[in-house]
């Protein structure tokens, strides 16, 4: 069983389904409203747990109704929460999500996520030392992201840095990560490059191995030499929220099988995740993933 530590955000997603996205100053009638668990850290933790990994999460929640619901939901999924702080003077993070035509628009209010600290990462030293991989994203303070990357590197544990939401990062951080997993837009921001530049060129310029996600087109990955391509899988898209988080989680869980196999399984898991509503609603288990891959091979 893979042991995964996730350092990241926990949100309550406030999801509105609509026939289309609204313009400035416009009001339309929505079709459905739901509250659903989310946040990149929590999503990746749940996705990894559903795929059979032993998962611990480092993060923070407010001492409020959303926080109680989110903590209970994560515990039900089997995620270890000893390193998730409960902050009495902060609200839990939220994400307001509009879903239309299988695409989404998202506004995140960090709340307690803005107070996830490097000290929490240090306190999880023993967990990280035993882990097969560490996942970290950028919905938490950057000094905490840095602490995670540096500790994982020092302990010889692979750190997968998912640079979302993206901003330019110091080269030495990127060099310490085992893999960085941006989309094309995020990669350009990371490198301070023109987003219209060919993504294969950008991948070769990166100071670290890159696994580049391309939505329905699949993913490109590079450790040395030319980037390699893993095709995407055709599915009926209901909601793309959480697809990237599912991809990253599967990549971490299956990394021990080799990068190429891990990327293929990550693309398949992400494809399955978009077939149902909600960031966590479509995340597959190992049997569903294996059956889907067998069907594709046939």
Where are the language model's segments positioned?
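Aromatic/hydrophobic pocket-lining residues that form π-stacking "cages" and hydrophobic walls in ligand
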Residues: 44-45, 70, 148-150, 269
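Ribokinase/PfkB-type carbohydrate-kinase core domain
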Residues: 1-10, 71-86, 98-228, 294-297
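Glycine-rich phosphate/adenosyl-contacting loop at the front of the ribokinase-like
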Residues: 1-60, 65-76, 237
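Short glycine/proline- and charge-enriched loop/turn segments
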Residues: 21-30, 181-183, 228-231
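Gly/Ala-rich phosphate-binding loop of Rossmann-like dinucleotide-binding domains
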Residues: 49-50, 153, 256
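Short, glycine-/polar-rich solvent-exposed loops and beta-turns at beta-strand/coil boundaries
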Residues: 88-90
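Conserved phosphate-binding/catalytic region of the ribokinase-like
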Residues: 1-4, 168, 195-298
